[in-house]
Amino acid sequence: MEINPIIVIGVPRDGDGDPKAIKTNWQRAQESGIGCVIINDDMGSKAANAAKKAGAYVYVPDHAGEPPKSNYETDSGAERVARSLATFDRFYNHDIVINVHAKLPEMAADVIKAVMYPLADPYVMFSTFVVPISKEEAQSDDIIKAQIEIHPKRRVQVLTNSQVAEVTGFTRKISEAGPGPYYKQIPIYAYRRGALDKFVRYGPTVREMEENLEPDRALANGMRVGAVLLNSGLDA
């Protein structure tokens, strides 16, 4: 089946994105050769100006800077992306949406491409990245941890030291979760477009609101989430 992905780099909600990081990640996204790349500046900030001067397409939707219109909407990246795509791509030309957080450190172009590999399974609705976690990170509630089941026979062709897996749980507090091992989740996502719309319609779970744990919404509603285990980090 032919796919037509779009990469969306989101400017942080507070508008306090690092202009250099936004520009660099836009350049890596372009180098990946996946398809259309836009910077979603739904806050109407100036953080993406450096990338714009370098040739990036910065999309400032009509609702830029407006607060959510209903009491169940959150500041989650998925809702922001879905809301902007509803106008930017209202005819659904793009069937895969790759959401890259602008505050991430520099990453290799092949890493962005690799996030789509779990979607080769037609029952996986979206995918993300996980990396080995340090002891300090494991104890920090600021970091989302993932429990995964690795598919031993599935590897990512563009990244030799990586494996395809399926996520079985997300948590911030290991003390309240089941047995590990745990991995650090990296906030890059590849959504099937229909699954993204469904994800947003579900609305946040109580646990998501309490722990700021957006990916939990998918598992709580029976959506399968794939993962790519990066053993070499984002700059692989």
Indicate where each model-derived feature is located:
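Conserved core of the sugar-phosphate nucleotidyltransferase
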Residues: 107-205
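Conserved beta-loop-beta/alpha segment of the NTase-like Rossmann-fold superfamily
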Residues: 65-143
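Conserved alpha/beta core of the MobA/IspD/sugar-nucleotide pyrophosphorylase nucleotidyltransferase superfamily
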Residues: 180-236
